[in-house]
Amino acid sequence: MILTLAYFMLGTLLLGVFAEDTVSQIGINDSLWYPYDEALVLKPLPNNDLLLSFAFQLQSEPFDPAVSSMSYDAYEHYTTFPRAIPPLLESTATRQFHLRFTRGFWDALSWGQLPHAGKEAGASGVELWSQVQAMDQEQAFHNWKKLSNSLSGLFCSSLNFIDESRTTFPRRSYASDIGAPLFNSTEKLYLMRASLPNEPICTENLTPFIKLLPTRGKSGLTSLLDGHKLFDSLWNSISLDIATICSEDEDALCHYEMDARIEMVTHVPSALARGERPIPKPLDGNTLRCDTDKPFDSYQCFPLPEPSQTHFKLSQLFARPINNGNLFANRPTRICAEVDRSTWTAFLSVDDTIFSTHDNCFDLSNDQNEGGSGYDFILESTDTTKVTPIVPVPIHVSRSLTGNGQDRGGMRIVFHNDNDTPVKLIYFESLPWFMRVYLSSLQITSTTSPQLQENDIILDKYYLQAADRKRPGHLEFTMLIPANTDIVMTYQFDKALLQFAEYPPDANHGFEIDAAVITVLSLESSSSLYEMRTSTLLLSLSTPDFSMPYNVIILTSTIMGLIFGMLYNLMVKRMVTVEEADKITLQSGLKYKLLKLKEKFLGKKKTKTD
């Protein structure tokens, strides 16, 4: 026993010495880093707005698509890639999917184009599209439904409400820049898309998103992400893109790539004011921004334009600094500022030390943050009106409902091209089944070029009629908008009646209509250049009086109570005259019983006295 214990202690000591020597030999250039990149880009916008773009890129370990995870020789190894994603992709035969959570309004006139040419943003609410491998469309929809249900539980959203009445199969829209592999040559890839325009976006969707990242909100850029700050912005978008990439080598190994992004636009003075005054209260007179040229006794305060000078820290916007960089990635955390260098200056603050670079990009090295106080990013400007050039959108599109009846209505779409060159685009629209569109009522007019005809504008037309409760209306046009021209497209539709159980709890509020998707194409190669969405619409349908059943129940109960009372009285009571009733009352009342009791008592007392 003593000898065994001695051998054990000696082995432990040797193992500790070997481990200590091994750890001391591990350097920063060793092969223990993992494929994970994170970056933050800050871009000042006009009117003291600020665009913040968080980007996270991950890559899974290689795998052989010919080996199933259920086989005896299969193994799975995870590093930084989330473990919940690969089984989901394999069980649903999904080769790639794209998920968007978007809230707010993007001001294209002031802010220009969307980040990343609009390909990382979605429509208001929740939007999902994916490529699924299957034998036929029925099997593809089964896998699609399974995918949406799984993502619903993973991100705490209402994606489980996606059914066949909300799903469309785009023909030319939503084309991916990355080709999806086909693991079985006898099957095909099906592209499916669905949207929930009335889905509220909240912290319950952000928290699972952060948990997919390896830092999990504890370090790196994810330590900045807070639901209160993110959803208190003017516009925000959470995007998740996962694709299957296969090599063309002989081994034919594949891997998954995950691109997660968070974009937000915040108004800097408002964000700073919330930090200074968490509880709203009136401002002092000396802090009001008023025009002193106006009469001092005027009843109205004339606000001045936005302040042209600013100085703020990233910790003031998010109420916390960056908690170190990532400790395991093959590249350090990176922060960049896209600013006009003539009036803007960017600094990195580390342990009360300020750094600057020529390109306003900073790598967060953990060797610099020895004090452990975290990193802070500082932006200051002497003239906030000077920002980097705003790239205008290639085309402006607005959509609205027409008509005021409860049985029919119309749609009006305006395309405004203020460029000197024509714009080629794909107009995609998914309409609910209760909007019965009359394609024969489609009209194309132009206020600037009245001679234009429908064939001059619409190059290709695809329309799939909706089926009641089974399929939405699918409208997809390839259009060419001439230069410096306004095009108005209108069509009419009927409003179908819904069943009683199909109305939502807030039926009088209206029904949300999906946003239209516009994909701007290149005139030479027809490749996608820019993507944008219109705003969602609110359609009013004939709504029944839901209080009527309750009124009927109350009225019926009252009448039945009256009838039952009358019948009950006739059954248990006897009909007598008034005189007999008075006599019975005198002989059955409480006063009569007291008199009888008194007489009885006095009679007994008199008998005893005698």
From Swiss-Prot:
<feature type="signal peptide">
    <location>
        <begin position="1"/>
        <end position="19"/>
    </location>
</feature>
<feature type="glycosylation site" description="N-linked (GlcNAc...) asparagine">
    <location>
        <position position="184"/>
    </location>
</feature>
<comment type="function">
    <text>Component of the GPI transamidase complex. Involved in transfer of GPI to proteins.</text>
</comment>
<keyword id="KW-1133">Transmembrane helix</keyword>
<dbReference type="GO" id="GO:0016255">
    <property type="term" value="P:attachment of GPI anchor to protein"/>
</dbReference>
<protein>
    <recommendedName>
        <fullName>GPI transamidase component GPI16</fullName>
    </recommendedName>
</protein>
<comment type="similarity">
    <text>Belongs to the PIGT family.</text>
</comment>
<comment type="pathway">
    <text>Glycolipid biosynthesis; glycosylphosphatidylinositol-anchor biosynthesis.</text>
</comment>
<keyword id="KW-0812">Transmembrane</keyword>
<dbReference type="GO" id="GO:0042765">
    <property type="term" value="C:GPI-anchor transamidase complex"/>
</dbReference>
<keyword id="KW-0325">Glycoprotein</keyword>
<keyword id="KW-1015">Disulfide bond</keyword>
<dbReference type="GO" id="GO:0006506">
    <property type="term" value="P:GPI anchor biosynthetic process"/>
</dbReference>
<dbReference type="GO" id="GO:0031505">
    <property type="term" value="P:fungal-type cell wall organization"/>
</dbReference>
<keyword id="KW-0732">Signal</keyword>
<keyword id="KW-0256">Endoplasmic reticulum</keyword>
<dbReference type="Pfam" id="PF04113">
    <property type="entry name" value="Gpi16"/>
</dbReference>
<keyword id="KW-0472">Membrane</keyword>
<feature type="topological domain" description="Lumenal">
    <location>
        <begin position="20"/>
        <end position="551"/>
    </location>
</feature>
<keyword id="KW-0337">GPI-anchor biosynthesis</keyword>
<feature type="transmembrane region" description="Helical">
    <location>
        <begin position="552"/>
        <end position="572"/>
    </location>
</feature>
<comment type="subunit">
    <text>Forms a complex with CDC91, GPI17, GPI8 and GAA1.</text>
</comment>
<feature type="topological domain" description="Cytoplasmic">
    <location>
        <begin position="573"/>
        <end position="610"/>
    </location>
</feature>
<dbReference type="InterPro" id="IPR007245">
    <property type="entry name" value="PIG-T"/>
</dbReference>
<dbReference type="GO" id="GO:0005789">
    <property type="term" value="C:endoplasmic reticulum membrane"/>
</dbReference>
<dbReference type="GO" id="GO:0005783">
    <property type="term" value="C:endoplasmic reticulum"/>
</dbReference>
